[in-house]
């Protein structure tokens, strides 16, 4: 009998009979859930002795990580940011609600998961991993009012899958018979090379259709998929496999995460600006990069001469800068020209005169009707929002759509967010909006079909120019904020290595899944456009 037929039953028997032993074997197989991906030679010096000027293009998490790391090591750093604030997707800026009444707003709520190893280390190096609160529960709210809760589930890989069944997300008979039995194994088999070769040209919608997902499991998959700014028919199955490996099947931190209880500006960005100033780095806000040229000895950025460049803008900025850059080979430009952003995403912050019922964590994912993917109740945890509700009553909410349908106008998106919110919270019907801030952007990294092969790596192909951002192909699995921070460290390490300096340690979840390398079931061929299995 092939392994994929008997393995589920053997695993189930072992899990029931000797769970401590099985947990230990899983931890061993998954490298104790954490690996260091680079070697740090402690014999090498840490500080730069010769003058090196570095231009960091983009002040998001990736650029800030690289800039602060290099500035601390003695590089002369200049950071260029087109916005009037630092932070990128973690950025924050003030808006006026009324005369004498301002508020900080941002691109939206961010989660800080237990396996964000590099981001944690970066924040800890600044003394900023304080003032966080646990979300307590990870909730998906269905249109029928039913809730799928993940917070109390077992966190050990494989045990957490069984826990989903016990929580009613699926029934064992749904996944132990074909076709699901033969297809679900892909999520335990992550391997960067094989996974992307086999499944990068397969959409999650194709997988859903072939696997015949039960309704609640489909809901969990769909909401998770849209968090990567893509509808199911556009999202690469390989990228989804990587994200499931990263968040759920490679470590025992679970899906319960932390979040800061203060706005990102005082919590993160002001201290980061102070750290840059402490190490004599120059920051140019509201300064777009209008020209980049490679020269024999280095680079010219906006007319100024530099020895090295870190390209750390968002995906739209990176494509614009590199396709117009002088002295850059055409084959390098082609990689950047292939970059495209994901679908539009919308964030609507509203200050309203009615509150909503309690009993939910501050951030809740929703079963989308047409646009509403999640909402945040800021007045339940953020000091500034709490002060506003003390003065005015009501609530401060944020409504999210991660993948906006292409056929909707901005006004239609905004109205649909409000309408769908009331469907979930009818007690808010008839509310009045005192203030609102609506954002509709298209600048997030796309994880669409077939994009991985041409995705730029840290080494841009131009000597002295390195890339950082969540759009960069890394040699280890990472997603979202962790991918941005880790890529900043990898970019900085490349320049440190060039100068024979000690690198910064970079950690990752295990590089391969629990069942990676196992033979593929013949039925798996239905997922492979080229017949690979």
Mark where each language-model region is.
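Helical element adjacent to the flavin cofactor pocket in flavoenzyme catalytic cores
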Residues: 243-299, 306-308, 312
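Mobile amphipathic helical/loop "lid" adjacent to a hydrophobic cofactor/ligand pocket
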Residues: 119-120, 124-125, 129-241, 504
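N-terminal Rossmann-like FAD-binding beta1-loop-alpha1 element of flavoenzymes
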Residues: 49-79
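Extreme N-terminal leader/targeting segments of oxidoreductases
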Residues: 2-54, 72-73, 511, 515-533
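Mid-domain catalytic core of redox enzymes
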Residues: 12-23, 27-34, 287-397, 402-408, ...
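FAD-binding beta-loop-beta segment adjacent to the flavin cofactor pocket
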Residues: 385-391, 441-475
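Conserved FAD-binding subdomain of flavin-dependent enzymes
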Residues: 98-134
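Glycine-rich FAD pyrophosphate-binding loop
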Residues: 71-96
């Amino acid at each position: 009998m092939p392994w994929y037929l008997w393995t589920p039953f053997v695993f189930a028997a072992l899990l029931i009979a000797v769970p401590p032993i099985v947990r230990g074997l899983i931890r061993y197989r998954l490298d104790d859930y954490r690996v260091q991906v680079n070697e740090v030679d402690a014999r090498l010096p840490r500080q730069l002795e010769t003058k090196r000027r570095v231009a960091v293009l983009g002040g998001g998490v990736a650029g800030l990580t690289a800039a602060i790391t290099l500035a601390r090591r003695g590089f002369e750093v200049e950071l260029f940011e087109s916005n009037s604030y630092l932070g990128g997707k973690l950025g924050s800026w003030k808006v006026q609600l009324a005369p004498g009444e301002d508020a900080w707003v941002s691109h939206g709520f961010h989660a800080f998961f237990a396996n964000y190893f590099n981001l944690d280390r970066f924040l800890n190096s600044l003394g900023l991993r304080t003032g966080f609160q646990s979300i307590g529960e990870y909730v998906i709210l269905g249109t029928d009012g039913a809730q799928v809760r993940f917070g109390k589930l077992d966190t050990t890989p494989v045990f957490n899958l069984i826990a989903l069944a016990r929580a009613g997300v699926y029934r064992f008979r749904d996944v132990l018979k074909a076709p699901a039995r033969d297809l679900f194994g892909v999520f335990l088999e992550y391997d960067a090379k094989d996974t992307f070769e086999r499944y990068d040209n397969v959409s999650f919608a194709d997988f859903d259709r072939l696997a015949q997902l039960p309704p609640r499991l489909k809901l969990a998959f769909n909401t998770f998929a849209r968090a990567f700014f893509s509808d199911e028919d556009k999202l690469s199955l390989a990228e989804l496999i990587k994200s499931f490996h990263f968040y759920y099947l490679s470590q025992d931190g679970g899906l319960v995460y932390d979040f800061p209880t203060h706005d990102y500006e005082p919590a993160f960005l002001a201290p980061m600006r102070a750290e840059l100033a402490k190490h004599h780095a120059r920051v140019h806000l509201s300064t777009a990069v209008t020209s980049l040229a490679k020269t024999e000895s280095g680079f010219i950025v906006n007319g100024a001469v530099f020895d090295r460049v870190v390209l750390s803008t968002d995906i739209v900025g990176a494509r614009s800068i590199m396709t117009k850059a002088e002295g850059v080979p055409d084959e390098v430009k082609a990689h950047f020209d292939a970059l495209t952003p994901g679908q539009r995403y919308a964030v609507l912050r509203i200050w309203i005169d009615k509150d909503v019922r309690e009993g939910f964590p501050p951030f809740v994912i929703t079963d989308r009707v047409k646009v509403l993917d999640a909402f945040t109740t800021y007045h339940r945890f953020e000091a500034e929002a709490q002060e506003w509700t003390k003065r005015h009553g009501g609530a401060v909410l944020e409504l999210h759509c991660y993948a906006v349908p292409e056929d909707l106008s901005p006004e239609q998106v905004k109205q649909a967010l409000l309408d769908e919110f009331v469907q979930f919270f009818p007690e808010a019907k008839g509310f009045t909006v005192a203030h609102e801030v609506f954002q509709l952007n298209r600048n997030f990294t796309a994880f669409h079909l077939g994009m991985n092969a041409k995705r730029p790596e840290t080494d841009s192909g131009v000597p002295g120019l390195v890339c950082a951002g969540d759009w960069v192909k890394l040699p280890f699995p990472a997603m979202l904020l962790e991918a941005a921070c880790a890529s900043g460290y990898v970019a900085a390490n490349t320049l440190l290595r060039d100068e024979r300096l000690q690198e910064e340690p970079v950690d990752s979840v295990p590089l391969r899944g629990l069942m990676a390398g196992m033979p593929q079931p013949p039925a798996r061929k239905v997922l492979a456009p080229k017949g690979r299995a």
